[in-house]
Protein backbone atom coordinates (compact mmCIF):
# COMPACT_ATOMS: atom_id res chain seq x y z
CA UNK A 1 0.00 0.00 0.00
CA UNK A 2 2.76 2.42 0.90
CA UNK A 3 4.63 1.63 -2.34
CA UNK A 4 1.52 2.50 -4.47
CA UNK A 5 1.30 6.11 -3.40
CA UNK A 6 4.67 7.22 -4.78
CA UNK A 7 3.91 5.38 -8.02
CA UNK A 8 0.68 7.38 -8.59
CA UNK A 9 2.53 10.64 -7.95
CA UNK A 10 5.17 9.59 -10.43
CA UNK A 11 2.52 8.78 -13.02
CA UNK A 12 0.92 12.25 -12.59
CA UNK A 13 4.29 13.94 -13.05
CA UNK A 14 4.92 11.96 -16.21
CA UNK A 15 1.49 12.97 -17.62
CA UNK A 16 2.16 16.63 -16.96
CA UNK A 17 5.57 16.38 -18.55
CA UNK A 18 4.10 14.88 -21.69
CA UNK A 19 1.71 17.87 -22.21
CA UNK A 20 2.76 19.88 -25.29
CA UNK A 21 2.32 23.26 -23.59
CA UNK A 22 1.32 24.91 -20.34
CA UNK A 23 -1.74 27.21 -20.47
CA UNK A 24 -1.38 30.52 -18.66
CA UNK A 25 -4.21 32.67 -17.30
CA UNK A 26 -6.66 34.13 -19.84
CA UNK A 27 -6.42 37.85 -20.60
CA UNK A 28 -9.38 39.99 -21.66
CA UNK A 29 -8.96 42.63 -24.38
CA UNK A 30 -11.72 45.00 -25.54
CA UNK A 31 -11.75 46.26 -29.11
CA UNK A 32 -13.77 48.74 -31.19
CA UNK A 33 -15.62 47.85 -34.34
CA UNK A 34 -13.72 49.09 -37.38
CA UNK A 35 -10.58 49.73 -35.34
CA UNK A 36 -7.30 47.80 -34.96
CA UNK A 37 -6.30 45.70 -31.97
CA UNK A 38 -3.01 44.09 -30.97
CA UNK A 39 -3.03 40.83 -28.99
CA UNK A 40 0.31 40.42 -27.24
CA UNK A 41 2.27 37.20 -26.78
CA UNK A 42 5.74 37.23 -25.21
CA UNK A 43 8.33 34.47 -24.91
CA UNK A 44 10.50 34.06 -21.83
CA UNK A 45 13.65 34.42 -23.92
CA UNK A 46 14.22 37.41 -26.15
CA UNK A 47 14.94 35.58 -29.36
CA UNK A 48 13.22 34.51 -32.55
CA UNK A 49 11.44 31.22 -32.06
CA UNK A 50 8.49 29.25 -33.36
CA UNK A 51 4.99 30.53 -32.50
CA UNK A 52 1.43 30.02 -33.68
CA UNK A 53 -1.86 31.88 -33.21
CA UNK A 54 -5.07 29.84 -33.27
CA UNK A 55 -8.70 30.49 -32.49
CA UNK A 56 -10.84 28.54 -30.04
CA UNK A 57 -11.57 25.95 -32.74
CA UNK A 58 -7.83 25.26 -33.05
CA UNK A 59 -7.79 26.74 -36.56
CA UNK A 60 -4.45 28.32 -37.32
CA UNK A 61 -4.49 32.04 -38.01
CA UNK A 62 -0.81 32.82 -38.45
CA UNK A 63 2.62 31.65 -37.33
CA UNK A 64 6.26 31.45 -38.30
CA UNK A 65 7.98 28.93 -40.50
CA UNK A 66 11.69 29.47 -40.65
CA UNK A 67 11.89 33.22 -40.83
CA UNK A 68 8.68 33.73 -42.79
CA UNK A 69 5.17 34.57 -41.62
CA UNK A 70 2.60 32.02 -42.64
CA UNK A 71 -1.19 32.22 -42.43
CA UNK A 72 -3.81 29.55 -41.93
CA UNK A 73 -7.30 29.10 -43.43
CA UNK A 74 -9.12 31.25 -40.88
CA UNK A 75 -11.49 34.09 -41.72
CA UNK A 76 -8.88 36.53 -40.35
CA UNK A 77 -6.21 35.59 -42.88
CA UNK A 78 -6.57 38.85 -44.83
CA UNK A 79 -6.81 41.06 -41.72
CA UNK A 80 -4.28 39.47 -39.36
CA UNK A 81 -0.59 40.36 -39.19
CA UNK A 82 2.40 40.37 -36.82
CA UNK A 83 5.26 42.75 -36.10
CA UNK A 84 8.29 41.00 -37.60
CA UNK A 85 10.59 43.69 -36.26
CA UNK A 86 9.81 42.57 -32.69
CA UNK A 87 10.36 38.83 -33.12
CA UNK A 88 14.01 39.08 -32.12
CA UNK A 89 12.84 40.65 -28.84
CA UNK A 90 10.60 37.68 -28.06
CA UNK A 91 7.39 39.58 -28.88
CA UNK A 92 5.00 37.64 -31.13
CA UNK A 93 1.84 39.76 -31.07
CA UNK A 94 -1.04 39.38 -33.52
CA UNK A 95 -2.61 42.48 -35.07
CA UNK A 96 -6.21 42.34 -36.32
CA UNK A 97 -7.38 45.18 -38.55
CA UNK A 98 -10.90 46.44 -39.28
CA UNK A 99 -12.43 44.65 -36.33
CA UNK A 100 -15.89 43.12 -36.57
CA UNK A 101 -18.27 42.08 -33.82
CA UNK A 102 -17.94 38.45 -34.96
CA UNK A 103 -14.17 38.65 -34.34
CA UNK A 104 -14.98 38.30 -30.64
CA UNK A 105 -13.37 35.00 -29.66
CA UNK A 106 -10.69 33.34 -27.56
CA UNK A 107 -7.33 33.38 -29.31
CA UNK A 108 -4.43 31.09 -28.32
CA UNK A 109 -0.76 31.88 -28.74
CA UNK A 110 1.58 28.86 -28.60
CA UNK A 111 5.24 29.65 -28.02
CA UNK A 112 8.02 27.76 -26.20
CA UNK A 113 5.65 24.93 -25.20
CA UNK A 114 3.40 27.48 -23.50
CA UNK A 115 -0.05 28.73 -24.30
CA UNK A 116 -1.40 32.23 -23.77
CA UNK A 117 -5.15 32.69 -24.09
CA UNK A 118 -6.56 36.11 -24.97
CA UNK A 119 -10.31 36.75 -24.97
CA UNK A 120 -11.17 39.47 -27.47
CA UNK A 121 -14.52 41.28 -27.09
CA UNK A 122 -15.40 43.68 -29.90
CA UNK A 123 -17.99 46.45 -29.35
CA UNK A 124 -19.54 49.01 -31.65
CA UNK A 125 -21.33 52.24 -30.67
CA UNK A 126 -23.30 54.09 -33.31
CA UNK A 127 -26.06 56.70 -33.59
CA UNK A 128 -29.35 55.29 -34.84
CA UNK A 129 -29.97 58.33 -37.04
CA UNK A 130 -27.88 61.00 -38.69
CA UNK A 131 -25.29 62.61 -36.43
CA UNK A 132 -26.45 66.04 -37.73
CA UNK A 133 -29.57 66.77 -35.68
CA UNK A 134 -31.73 69.84 -35.16
CA UNK A 135 -31.88 71.42 -31.75
CA UNK A 136 -34.65 69.76 -29.75
CA UNK A 137 -34.48 66.45 -31.58
CA UNK A 138 -33.60 63.16 -29.87
CA UNK A 139 -30.29 61.32 -30.03
CA UNK A 140 -30.17 57.53 -29.63
CA UNK A 141 -26.92 55.58 -29.29
CA UNK A 142 -26.92 51.81 -29.76
CA UNK A 143 -24.19 49.49 -28.50
CA UNK A 144 -23.30 46.40 -30.52
CA UNK A 145 -21.79 43.67 -28.36
CA UNK A 146 -20.84 39.98 -28.67
CA UNK A 147 -23.23 37.30 -27.38
CA UNK A 148 -22.90 36.50 -23.70
CA UNK A 149 -21.45 39.89 -22.74
CA UNK A 150 -23.09 42.30 -20.31
CA UNK A 151 -21.42 45.68 -20.83
CA UNK A 152 -22.32 49.05 -19.34
CA UNK A 153 -21.99 52.39 -21.12
CA UNK A 154 -21.40 55.92 -19.86
CA UNK A 155 -21.36 58.95 -22.16
CA UNK A 156 -20.47 62.58 -21.55
CA UNK A 157 -21.41 65.46 -23.84
CA UNK A 158 -19.18 68.48 -24.57
CA UNK A 159 -21.47 70.52 -22.34
CA UNK A 160 -21.00 68.16 -19.38
CA UNK A 161 -24.24 66.20 -19.71
CA UNK A 162 -23.86 62.58 -18.48
CA UNK A 163 -25.97 59.62 -19.58
CA UNK A 164 -25.55 55.93 -18.86
CA UNK A 165 -27.26 52.67 -19.65
CA UNK A 166 -26.95 49.28 -21.26
CA UNK A 167 -27.14 48.57 -24.95
CA UNK A 168 -29.27 51.67 -25.72
CA UNK A 169 -28.78 55.25 -24.60
CA UNK A 170 -31.18 58.09 -25.40
CA UNK A 171 -30.96 61.89 -25.12
CA UNK A 172 -34.51 63.26 -25.59
CA UNK A 173 -33.86 66.97 -26.12
CA UNK A 174 -30.59 68.01 -27.75
CA UNK A 175 -29.30 71.48 -26.92
CA UNK A 176 -26.78 73.58 -28.82
CA UNK A 177 -24.14 72.96 -26.13
CA UNK A 178 -24.43 69.23 -26.88
CA UNK A 179 -22.78 69.81 -30.24
CA UNK A 180 -19.25 68.40 -30.46
CA UNK A 181 -17.42 65.21 -29.57
CA UNK A 182 -19.14 62.87 -27.14
CA UNK A 183 -16.91 60.56 -25.07
CA UNK A 184 -18.42 57.16 -24.30
CA UNK A 185 -16.82 54.45 -22.15
CA UNK A 186 -17.83 50.79 -22.46
CA UNK A 187 -16.98 48.59 -19.46
CA UNK A 188 -16.80 44.78 -19.37
CA UNK A 189 -14.97 42.50 -16.92
CA UNK A 190 -13.22 45.50 -15.31
CA UNK A 191 -11.85 46.46 -18.73
CA UNK A 192 -12.83 49.59 -20.64
CA UNK A 193 -12.77 50.84 -24.20
CA UNK A 194 -13.47 54.45 -25.19
CA UNK A 195 -15.51 55.72 -28.14
CA UNK A 196 -15.52 59.21 -29.65
CA UNK A 197 -18.69 60.22 -31.49
CA UNK A 198 -19.06 63.58 -33.23
CA UNK A 199 -22.56 65.02 -32.88
CA UNK A 200 -23.52 68.21 -34.73
CA UNK A 201 -26.51 70.10 -33.32
CA UNK A 202 -27.96 72.32 -36.03
CA UNK A 203 -28.89 75.58 -34.29
CA UNK A 204 -28.18 79.28 -34.08
CA UNK A 205 -25.50 80.39 -31.64
CA UNK A 206 -28.13 82.20 -29.57
CA UNK A 207 -31.71 81.29 -28.84
CA UNK A 208 -32.63 84.95 -28.33
CA UNK A 209 -31.03 88.38 -28.59
CA UNK A 210 -32.14 91.95 -27.85
CA UNK A 211 -31.01 95.09 -29.66
CA UNK A 212 -31.29 98.46 -27.86
CA UNK A 213 -31.37 101.59 -30.03
CA UNK A 214 -32.25 105.27 -29.83
CA UNK A 215 -34.93 106.57 -32.14
CA UNK A 216 -33.52 107.18 -35.61
CA UNK A 217 -30.43 104.99 -35.25
CA UNK A 218 -29.60 102.19 -37.69
CA UNK A 219 -30.34 98.68 -36.42
CA UNK A 220 -28.19 95.60 -37.13
CA UNK A 221 -29.58 92.08 -36.60
CA UNK A 222 -27.16 89.13 -36.77
CA UNK A 223 -27.99 85.40 -36.75
CA UNK A 224 -24.72 83.37 -36.63
CA UNK A 225 -24.97 79.59 -36.88
CA UNK A 226 -23.50 77.26 -34.27
CA UNK A 227 -22.20 74.83 -36.90
CA UNK A 228 -20.39 74.71 -40.23
CA UNK A 229 -21.23 72.56 -43.23
CA UNK A 230 -19.54 72.34 -46.61
CA UNK A 231 -22.85 72.58 -48.45
CA UNK A 232 -25.60 74.54 -46.77
CA UNK A 233 -28.87 75.11 -48.59
CA UNK A 234 -32.35 76.02 -47.43
CA UNK A 235 -34.81 78.88 -47.06
CA UNK A 236 -35.78 81.28 -44.30
CA UNK A 237 -38.20 83.96 -43.18
CA UNK A 238 -38.44 86.69 -40.54
CA UNK A 239 -41.83 87.24 -38.92
CA UNK A 240 -42.25 90.40 -36.82
CA UNK A 241 -44.73 91.30 -34.10
CA UNK A 242 -44.60 95.04 -33.46
CA UNK A 243 -45.67 96.17 -30.00
CA UNK A 244 -48.19 98.59 -31.47
CA UNK A 245 -49.57 96.12 -34.05
CA UNK A 246 -52.45 93.73 -33.48
CA UNK A 247 -50.87 90.88 -35.48
CA UNK A 248 -47.49 89.78 -36.81
CA UNK A 249 -46.36 90.03 -40.42
CA UNK A 250 -43.60 88.69 -42.61
CA UNK A 251 -40.80 91.22 -43.08
CA UNK A 252 -38.53 89.26 -45.41
CA UNK A 253 -38.09 85.84 -47.05
CA UNK A 254 -34.85 84.50 -48.50
CA UNK A 255 -33.07 81.49 -49.97
CA UNK A 256 -29.74 80.01 -48.90
CA UNK A 257 -27.65 78.09 -51.43
CA UNK A 258 -24.00 77.10 -50.98
CA UNK A 259 -23.69 79.65 -48.16
CA UNK A 260 -24.95 82.50 -50.39
CA UNK A 261 -28.10 84.44 -49.50
CA UNK A 262 -30.65 85.79 -51.99
CA UNK A 263 -33.73 87.82 -51.01
CA UNK A 264 -37.07 86.60 -52.38
CA UNK A 265 -39.47 89.16 -50.92
CA UNK A 266 -39.22 92.14 -48.58
CA UNK A 267 -41.79 94.59 -47.21
CA UNK A 268 -41.71 98.24 -48.21
CA UNK A 269 -42.24 99.45 -44.66
CA UNK A 270 -39.78 98.79 -43.24
CA UNK A 271 -37.50 97.96 -46.16
CA UNK A 272 -34.86 95.67 -44.71
CA UNK A 273 -31.46 95.07 -46.25
CA UNK A 274 -29.84 91.61 -46.10
CA UNK A 275 -26.23 90.53 -46.48
CA UNK A 276 -25.35 88.11 -49.28
CA UNK A 277 -22.98 85.94 -47.22
CA UNK A 278 -23.12 84.06 -43.94
CA UNK A 279 -23.68 84.80 -41.13
CA UNK A 280 -27.25 85.90 -41.79
CA UNK A 281 -27.34 89.67 -41.35
CA UNK A 282 -30.25 92.15 -41.54
CA UNK A 283 -30.18 95.97 -41.47
CA UNK A 284 -33.09 98.21 -40.47
CA UNK A 285 -32.41 101.79 -41.70
CA UNK A 286 -34.04 103.52 -38.72
CA UNK A 287 -35.20 102.49 -35.27
CA UNK A 288 -38.69 103.90 -34.86
CA UNK A 289 -41.27 103.28 -32.11
CA UNK A 290 -43.64 101.59 -34.58
CA UNK A 291 -40.97 98.95 -35.32
CA UNK A 292 -40.24 98.08 -31.68
CA UNK A 293 -41.25 94.51 -30.88
CA UNK A 294 -40.19 90.87 -31.30
CA UNK A 295 -39.28 88.80 -34.34
CA UNK A 296 -38.73 85.12 -35.08
CA UNK A 297 -36.25 84.06 -37.76
CA UNK A 298 -36.76 80.53 -39.09
CA UNK A 299 -34.37 78.58 -41.30
CA UNK A 300 -35.40 75.33 -43.00
CA UNK A 301 -32.47 73.23 -44.21
CA UNK A 302 -32.77 70.89 -47.16
CA UNK A 303 -33.05 67.16 -46.33
CA UNK A 304 -33.86 68.00 -42.70
CA UNK A 305 -37.22 67.85 -40.96
CA UNK A 306 -37.97 70.82 -38.76
CA UNK A 307 -36.62 74.36 -38.65
CA UNK A 308 -34.00 76.38 -36.83
CA UNK A 309 -35.35 79.27 -34.75
CA UNK A 310 -33.92 82.44 -33.24
CA UNK A 311 -35.90 85.15 -31.48
CA UNK A 312 -34.80 88.77 -31.76
CA UNK A 313 -36.15 91.80 -29.87
CA UNK A 314 -35.91 95.51 -30.65
CA UNK A 315 -36.19 98.16 -27.90
CA UNK A 316 -36.42 101.81 -29.02
CA UNK A 317 -35.87 104.86 -26.78
CA UNK A 318 -37.17 108.41 -27.28
CA UNK A 319 -36.47 111.53 -25.17
CA UNK A 320 -38.64 114.59 -25.91
CA UNK A 321 -39.54 118.00 -24.46
CA UNK A 322 -42.99 119.44 -25.03
CA UNK A 323 -43.87 122.75 -23.42
CA UNK A 324 -43.02 122.30 -19.72
CA UNK A 325 -42.80 118.48 -19.80
CA UNK A 326 -39.60 116.42 -20.31
CA UNK A 327 -40.39 112.77 -21.16
CA UNK A 328 -38.30 109.60 -21.55
CA UNK A 329 -40.00 106.57 -23.13
CA UNK A 330 -39.08 103.09 -24.39
CA UNK A 331 -40.99 100.74 -26.68
CA UNK A 332 -40.49 97.05 -27.16
CA UNK A 333 -40.18 93.96 -24.93
CA UNK A 334 -38.47 94.86 -21.66
CA UNK A 335 -38.17 93.06 -18.35
CA UNK A 336 -40.16 94.46 -15.41
CA UNK A 337 -36.84 94.59 -13.53
CA UNK A 338 -35.38 97.21 -15.88
CA UNK A 339 -35.21 100.79 -14.61
CA UNK A 340 -35.89 103.90 -16.69
CA UNK A 341 -34.36 107.15 -15.39
CA UNK A 342 -34.13 110.85 -16.18
CA UNK A 343 -30.97 112.40 -14.77
CA UNK A 344 -29.64 115.95 -14.95
CA UNK A 345 -25.96 115.86 -15.82
CA UNK A 346 -23.55 116.97 -13.06
CA UNK A 347 -26.44 117.31 -10.62
CA UNK A 348 -28.28 114.97 -8.28
CA UNK A 349 -31.68 115.47 -9.87
CA UNK A 350 -32.93 112.01 -10.85
CA UNK A 351 -36.31 110.45 -11.55
CA UNK A 352 -36.37 106.63 -11.77
CA UNK A 353 -39.14 104.10 -12.26
CA UNK A 354 -39.52 100.47 -13.24
CA UNK A 355 -41.79 101.54 -16.06
CA UNK A 356 -41.71 102.34 -19.76
CA UNK A 357 -42.05 106.11 -19.32
CA UNK A 358 -40.79 108.76 -16.88
CA UNK A 359 -41.16 112.52 -17.00
CA UNK A 360 -40.18 115.75 -15.26
CA UNK A 361 -42.38 118.87 -15.09
CA UNK A 362 -40.66 122.23 -15.46
CA UNK A 363 -37.18 120.69 -15.88
CA UNK A 364 -34.08 122.67 -15.02
CA UNK A 365 -31.90 123.88 -17.86
CA UNK A 366 -29.01 121.61 -18.79
CA UNK A 367 -28.17 118.26 -20.38
CA UNK A 368 -30.55 115.51 -19.31
CA UNK A 369 -29.80 111.81 -19.66
CA UNK A 370 -32.47 109.22 -20.38
CA UNK A 371 -31.12 105.86 -19.10
CA UNK A 372 -32.41 102.29 -19.36
CA UNK A 373 -30.57 100.14 -16.81
CA UNK A 374 -30.47 96.56 -15.58
CA UNK A 375 -29.09 96.22 -12.04
CA UNK A 376 -26.90 99.28 -12.52
CA UNK A 377 -25.71 98.34 -16.01
CA UNK A 378 -26.75 100.90 -18.62
CA UNK A 379 -28.34 99.23 -21.65
CA UNK A 380 -29.43 102.33 -23.53
CA UNK A 381 -28.80 106.07 -23.18
CA UNK A 382 -30.18 109.16 -24.89
CA UNK A 383 -29.32 112.81 -24.16
CA UNK A 384 -31.55 115.85 -24.55
CA UNK A 385 -30.68 119.49 -23.85
CA UNK A 386 -33.12 121.74 -22.03
CA UNK A 387 -32.51 125.45 -22.75
CA UNK A 388 -33.31 128.14 -20.13
CA UNK A 389 -36.57 130.09 -20.56
CA UNK A 390 -36.81 133.78 -19.49
CA UNK A 391 -40.10 135.04 -17.91
CA UNK A 392 -41.96 137.67 -20.04
CA UNK A 393 -45.03 139.85 -19.14
CA UNK A 394 -47.37 137.72 -21.12
CA UNK A 395 -50.67 138.90 -19.54
CA UNK A 396 -50.13 142.72 -19.75
CA UNK A 397 -49.05 142.38 -23.35
CA UNK A 398 -52.09 140.32 -24.10
CA UNK A 399 -54.33 142.91 -22.45
CA UNK A 400 -52.70 145.69 -24.46
CA UNK A 401 -53.21 143.78 -27.68
CA UNK A 402 -56.80 142.97 -26.82
CA UNK A 403 -57.46 146.58 -25.82
CA UNK A 404 -55.98 147.86 -29.04
CA UNK A 405 -58.08 145.50 -31.10
CA UNK A 406 -61.21 146.44 -29.17
CA UNK A 407 -60.49 150.17 -29.56
CA UNK A 408 -59.90 149.75 -33.25
CA UNK A 409 -63.17 147.90 -33.66
CA UNK A 410 -65.02 150.55 -31.61
CA UNK A 411 -63.47 153.40 -33.61
CA UNK A 412 -64.34 151.69 -36.85
CA UNK A 413 -67.92 151.11 -35.72
CA UNK A 414 -68.38 154.74 -34.62
CA UNK A 415 -66.91 155.96 -37.87
CA UNK A 416 -69.32 153.88 -39.88
CA UNK A 417 -72.24 155.04 -37.70
CA UNK A 418 -71.45 158.73 -38.11
CA UNK A 419 -70.84 158.35 -41.84
CA UNK A 420 -74.22 156.74 -42.34
CA UNK A 421 -75.92 159.38 -40.19
CA UNK A 422 -74.22 162.20 -42.02
CA UNK A 423 -75.20 160.76 -45.39
CA UNK A 424 -78.78 160.40 -44.24
CA UNK A 425 -78.90 164.04 -43.11
CA UNK A 426 -77.42 165.17 -46.39
CA UNK A 427 -80.08 163.36 -48.38
CA UNK A 428 -82.78 164.78 -46.12
CA UNK A 429 -81.42 168.31 -46.62
CA UNK A 430 -81.40 167.82 -50.39
CA UNK A 431 -85.03 166.77 -50.34
CA UNK A 432 -86.04 169.76 -48.21
CA UNK A 433 -84.22 172.07 -50.59
CA UNK A 434 -86.03 170.54 -53.55
CA UNK A 435 -89.43 171.01 -51.85
CA UNK A 436 -88.69 174.65 -51.04
CA UNK A 437 -87.61 175.23 -54.61
CA UNK A 438 -90.83 173.75 -55.93
CA UNK A 439 -92.93 175.82 -53.55
CA UNK A 440 -91.12 178.94 -54.47
CA UNK A 441 -91.95 178.30 -58.13
CA UNK A 442 -95.62 178.04 -57.04
CA UNK A 443 -95.96 174.56 -58.26
CA UNK A 444 -98.51 172.79 -56.29
CA UNK A 445 -99.94 169.33 -56.44
CA UNK A 446 -103.05 168.97 -58.62
CA UNK A 447 -104.47 166.08 -56.80
CA UNK A 448 -104.11 164.31 -53.49
CA UNK A 449 -102.76 161.23 -55.33
CA UNK A 450 -99.86 163.12 -56.89
CA UNK A 451 -99.19 164.88 -53.64
CA UNK A 452 -98.86 161.57 -51.84
CA UNK A 453 -96.32 160.33 -54.43
CA UNK A 454 -94.17 163.41 -54.89
CA UNK A 455 -94.51 165.39 -51.79
CA UNK A 456 -93.40 164.62 -48.38
CA UNK A 457 -94.64 166.39 -45.31
CA UNK A 458 -92.58 169.23 -44.04
Swiss-Prot record:
Ranges in the topological domain labelled Extracellular: 26-396
GO cellular component annotations of the record: cell surface; plasma membrane
Leader peptide range in chain numbering: 1-25
Taxonomy, superkingdom: Eukaryota
Sugar-modified residues: 42, 296, 325
Localization annotation: Cell membrane
Pfam families for the chain: C2-set, CD4-extracel, ig, Tcell_CD4_C
Residue span, Ig-like V-type domain: 26-125
Membrane topology, as annotated: Single-pass type I membrane protein
Gene Ontology molecular functions: coreceptor activity; MHC class II protein complex binding
Topology Cytoplasmic: residue spans: 419-458
GO BP, sorted A to Z: adaptive immune response; cell adhesion; T cell differentiation; T cell selection
Chief location category: membrane
Disulfide bonds: 41-109, 155-184, 328-370
Lipidation (S-palmitoyl cysteine): 419, 422
Gene3D superfamilies in the record: Immunoglobulins, transmembrane domain of human cd4
Domain remarks: The Ig-like V-type domain mediates the interaction with MHCII.
Described function: Integral membrane glycoprotein that plays an essential role in the immune response and serves multiple functions in responses against both external and internal offenses. In T-cells, functions primarily as a coreceptor for MHC class II molecule:peptide complex. The antigens presented by class II peptides are derived from extracellular proteins while class I peptides are derived from cytosolic proteins. Interacts simultaneously with the T-cell receptor (TCR) and the MHC class II presented by antigen presenting cells (APCs).
Quaternary structure note: Forms disulfide-linked homodimers at the cell surface. Interacts with LCK. Interacts with PTK2/FAK1. Binds to P4HB/PDI. Interacts with IL16; this interaction induces a CD4-dependent signaling in lymphocytes. Interacts (via Ig-like V-type domain) with MHCII alpha chain (via alpha-2 domain) and beta chain (via beta-2 domain); this interaction increases the affinity of TCR for peptide-MHCII. CD4 oligomerization via Ig-like C2-type 2 and 3 domains appears to be required for stable binding to MHCII and adhesion between T cells and APCs.
Record-given protein name: T-cell surface glycoprotein CD4
Species assigned in the record: Macaca nemestrina
Gene: CD4
